[in-house]
């Protein structure tokens, strides 16, 4: 049963990253499957609603990831200034590590799909 979860998690992680880099509309499902190394059937098994469902799951995952990073930074910061500085540095480091390819994990997809 662990393989099923791994397949779903790999697919979701790949989709989340690709949506950040290419946008929701710029990412095809075959791109997600190739990046995850998953067979086509597994995507529709885990996400029967197709691209819209995996897009929502990617937004949920990105939101939870950002929320937990902010919560950890808040707990570790002795002041509001230290907290804000830490968040800004973490965002800058994420951009630099991705060679400025990763967009905001939430805004990239949310802005493209808001009117739909």
Mark where each language-model region is.
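A generic short alpha-helical patch detector that favors 3-5-residue windows
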Residues: 7, 31, 98-102
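Short, intrinsically disordered, charge-balanced linker/junction segments flanking boundaries
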Residues: 113-116
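Helix-turn-helix
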Residues: 10, 14-57
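N-terminal intrinsically disordered/low-complexity leader segments
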Residues: 1-6, 77
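Short, basic, alpha-helical segments at the C-terminal edge of helix-turn-helix-like DNA-binding modules
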Residues: 60-65
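Hydrophobic alpha-helical connector segments
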Residues: 70-102
């Amino acid at each position: 049963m662990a393989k099923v979860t791994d397949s779903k998690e790999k697919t979701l992680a790949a989709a989340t990253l690709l949506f950040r880099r290419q946008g929701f509309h710029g990412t095809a499902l075959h791109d997600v499957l190739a990046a995850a190394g998953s067979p086509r059937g597994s995507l529709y098994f885990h996400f029967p609603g197709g691209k819209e469902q995996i897009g929502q799951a990617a937004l949920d995952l990105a939101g939870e990831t950002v929320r937990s990073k902010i919560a950890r930074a808040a707990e570790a910061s002795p002041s509001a200034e230290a907290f804000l500085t830490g968040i800004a540095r973490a965002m800058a480091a994420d951009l630099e590590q991705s060679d400025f390819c990763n967009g905001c994990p939430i805004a990239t997809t949310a802005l493209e799909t808001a009117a739909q």
